[in-house]
A protein has these predicted regions:
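Ankyrin-repeat boundary/"N-cap" motif
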Residues: 227-237, 262-270, 296-303, 329-336, ...
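Leucine/isoleucine-rich amphipathic helices and adjacent mixed helix/strand linkers
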Residues: 1-265, 273-284, 310
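Thr-biased low-complexity repeat/linker tracts and other Thr-enriched repetitive architectures
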Residues: 313, 330, 346, 356, ...
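Leucine-rich solenoid repeat scaffolds
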Residues: 452, 458-485
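Ankyrin repeat domain, specifically the short helix-to-loop turn at the C-terminus of the second helix
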Residues: 251-259, 284-292, 317-325, 350-358, ...
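Conserved ankyrin/ankyrin-like repeat signature
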Residues: 247-248, 281-282, 314-315, 347-348, ...
Length: 485
């Protein structure tokens, strides 16, 4: 179009007559104009834009042009391939398919129109000539491409890479935050495996570099940047298990068997990391290599508690049959029965009861298992515990008895179950409240009705809230105040 104003009329007519008849033909013609030596770069740019988890800056996207995808062993980041003119280079390989916008001081790269990706992922493109059809986009290969790019820049890190040098590496923060996601989505393809083996090799510093930039082994709200930028003691097996990389765990177990019980910070052992993140194939692999199931580190407790909480029935059975303590407990969350009951895994609860789990043991912050069940509202688990000679009036935890807990949480059906099986309607909690006072104060009118029908003392008072009627009135629960006594 730039030359038309200076062209003869006959030339203008010829150009207009040769214009593509459809958008697909327009895109196909643009792709055919991409130089043959650049087509793979163009393909990788499309891959990156297809599956990137967030918009990329022009500099980040230009990383595609600095990756040697045919390097020996695994794709490699070539620093000398970086360009001082990233926008011009991207336009060279992608023509008019790309556009750039300024957002908060950053130059962001994007496809020029949503129809571009629709065309590239459609079946229609496969009906065009081979040099166009080769650009067909598929999701899994796209994740493989971006995973290779992420690994390439992470493998560029070593113990001598300072903070300033890191900031000069394109896409480094994106890579640190997202490579695990892309690698999982790429199903740890053959093309990714060599890079993973280098990253998780205990003799290399690359894994420590990633952990320094973005430590996934932190709790919510904690900074991802670690305090120590050179955690060279990072345990590869622990992180591989946490990430869910089955083949890599198998490789590390066969190559570095001493790492079996190495400790991380958040979960403790590789086995607990695998169980908590539901990587069951890895968990079985570690158990079959005789992983230690007695370790009490981290926040989550030993493997039996974690497996019970996550509902991993067969692993719970395996651990119990080989002799793990059915009543093992962690100071905050209690025993396997506490956690399985609290989450509502009825099959696990039944199994634990078959192995004579103590239904009245008090531990953790809630008291006995029945109190946990009541607070969480799992009627089925409450029924299983009731059938196992549970003490309906056990005291403990924040609320007092299970009936106090049910009254506080408004659990109508569980309240009915407790009342029908001997719960004391006039029991006192630590603060001297009865269940009726608790239900009144919290505004649970239906629970109040149930308690009154079962003969609770409606005249009872305590020094903090007074009578049930006063407690309800002060909180504005008029429906409770008017419940007939």
């Amino acid at each position: 179009m730039d030359i038309l104003p200076r062209s003869l009329p006959a030339t203008v007519v010829r150009v207009v007559e040769e214009l593509p008849e459809s958008l697909d033909q327009t895109y196909a013609r643009i792709l055919l104009r991409v130089a043959e030596e650049n087509w793979e770069h163009t393909y990788h740019v499309f891959h990156t834009l297809m599956v990137a988890t967030r918009p990329l800056t022009m500099e980040d996207l230009c990383l595609v042009l600095a990756i040697d995808f045919i390097a020996e062993v695994t794709p490699k980041y070539e620093e000398i391939w970086r360009s001082d003119e990233p926008e011009d280079n991207l336009i060279t390989v992608c023509s008019t398919f790309l556009s750039f916008i300024d957002v908060d001081g950053s130059r962001m790269a994007q496809l020029s129109h949503y129809s571009v990706m629709e065309f590239l992922t459609s079946q229609r493109i496969l009906r065009l000539e081979p040099k166009v059809a080769r650009y067909r986009m598929y999701e899994e290969p796209a994740h493989v491409t971006i995973a290779q790019m992420c690994l390439a820049v992470l493998l560029h890190l070593d113990e001598h890479t300072g903070k300033h040098a890191v900031e000069e590496i394109p896409m480094i923060h994106y890579a640190a935050e997202n490579w695990v996601y892309h690698t999982r989505f790429g199903n740890v393809a053959t093309e990714i495996r060599p890079g993973l083996e280098l990253l998780f090799n205990p003799k290399n510093p690359h894994l420590a570099g990633w952990v320094w930039l973005h430590d996934i082994d932190t709790f919510w709200g904690e900074p991802k940047i670690t305090a120590n930028p050179r955690r060279l003691d990072t345990a590869p097996l622990y992180y591989a298990a946490q990430c869910g990389f089955t083949d890599m765990v198998d490789h590390l177990l066969s190559t570095y068997p001493r790492q079996l019980n190495t400790l991380g910070s958040r979960y403790g052992t590789p086995l607990i990391a695998a169980l908590e993140n539901d990587h069951l194939e890895i968990a079985w692999m570690l158990l079959n290599h005789s992983a230690d199931t007695t370790v009490m580190t981290g926040f989550y407790g030993p493997p039996l508690i974690v497996a019970a909480k996550r509902g991993h029935l067969e692993i719970v059975r395996f651990l119990l049959e080989r002799g793990d303590d059915v009543n093992v407990w962690e100071s905050y969350i209690g025993t396997p029965l506490h956690v399985a009951s609290g989450v509502g895994h009825l099959d696990v609860v039944s199994l634990l009861l078959e192995f004579n789990a103590d239904v009245n043991i008090r531990g953790g912050c809630y008291g006995a298992p029945l109190q946990v069940v009541t607070i969480r509202g799992h009627l089925g688990a409450a029924q299983l515990l009731r059938e196992s000679s549970v003490d309906m009036n056990t005291q403990g935890g924040y609320h007092g008895t299970p009936l106090h807990a049910a009254s506080a949480e408004g659990r109508v059906e569980i309240t009915r179950l407790l009342l029908e099986h001997g719960a004391d309607t006039n029991a006192r909690a630590i603060n001297s409240e009865t269940p009726l006072q608790v239900a009144s104060r919290m505004g649970h009118a239906e629970v109040v009705r149930l308690l009154i029908r079962h003969g609770t003392d409606i005249s009872v008072e305590d020094s903090v809230f007074g009578s049930p009627e006063v407690a309800a009135s002060e909180r504005g629960h008029q429906d409770v105040v008017h419940v007939p006594g």
